[in-house]
Amino acid sequence: MNRKIIFFAVIAGIALAAAVPFIVFHARSPVLVVADNSIIQLYGSSRISREAFHSSLDLFRPVKTVAAADDSGDDMVQFAIAEVSSRPYCVLFPLRFAGAARLYREKNPQVRAVLLEGRSPENRETDVFQDIFTYKTDIEADFLRMGAAAAAIDGGKNGKIAVFMETQLQTRGKDAFLRALSDLEEPPAPLFYASYSQFSGISDLSCVVLAGAGAEYLENFSGVPVVFLTWIDPSLIPNDVVLVVDDSPWVQAPRAIRMAAAGLESGLIKSRFLVLNEKKIGAQALRKIKKTG
């Protein structure tokens, strides 16, 4: 009889020990990511769930999405946040909801508010965002890696790389991209475009980079490997896209939360590089891309 009691006591102890982390995890206040419905649809609900799950494990606290209507005013966003959690650990806002972030911080001074500014211009006014953590995408680091990735995909063919880049990225992005090629003995030739209308058919094209411009190129189905800076659900992207650069709030959440917890009022966050088509890239190029981080 005593042995049975001891046995069941041990089993109960093991079960309790296993349950404690689960209980503690769900007892912790969540991180909230505010997003409008159009972005949620673009990114993909199942993809958001996966990213939130991984971020939750990384931070050891729940990460939840606050869905706001595309035309939501600042007050409506407050209601949407309150419906998800009345006591969040931190709330992440995209730049388009900057006014809602400021209002939330005024009403909830005990909760950290983070504004993810993405690739917004450096000279944008930020004085109005006092007491709000503001983080940007690390454009130079991203384009340095994109340049290295494009060179790896070229694989020494000495072909041409078409780089479609929105105007506001031209200075920092272009310089960083070129730096990635500068150390190569025989670098591929990058050709920069601000829009697809400037582009015409090019022979010896080994790679295409789409960074805020030139998305029309994907309609060509040319077979040339494409590096795409986008939030679009990969399941909706043509097979020519071999590498996606993702700076969405769900990807940036863990880093942003740690920076805010450390008291960093501003800072830069790198994007995630997601390989979609390993066979089209090739094993050697894939190894080089992974080495870039």
Model segments located where?
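Short, well-structured alpha-helical segments in soluble
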Residues: 74-87, 194-204
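Hinge/beta->alpha junction and helix N-cap segments in small-molecule ligand-binding domains
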Residues: 71, 135-143, 164-175, 191-198, ...
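Short beta-strand elements at the ligand-binding edges of bilobed clamshell
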Residues: 122-148, 238-250
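Short beta-strand elements of ligand-binding domains
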Residues: 92-95, 111-125, 226-232
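Extracytoplasmic "Venus flytrap"
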Residues: 30-74, 170
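Hydrophobic membrane-insertion alpha-helices, especially the h-region
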Residues: 8-21
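An alpha-beta-alpha
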Residues: 142-185, 264-284
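Structured C-terminal subdomain patch of bacterial secreted/periplasmic proteins
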Residues: 239-293
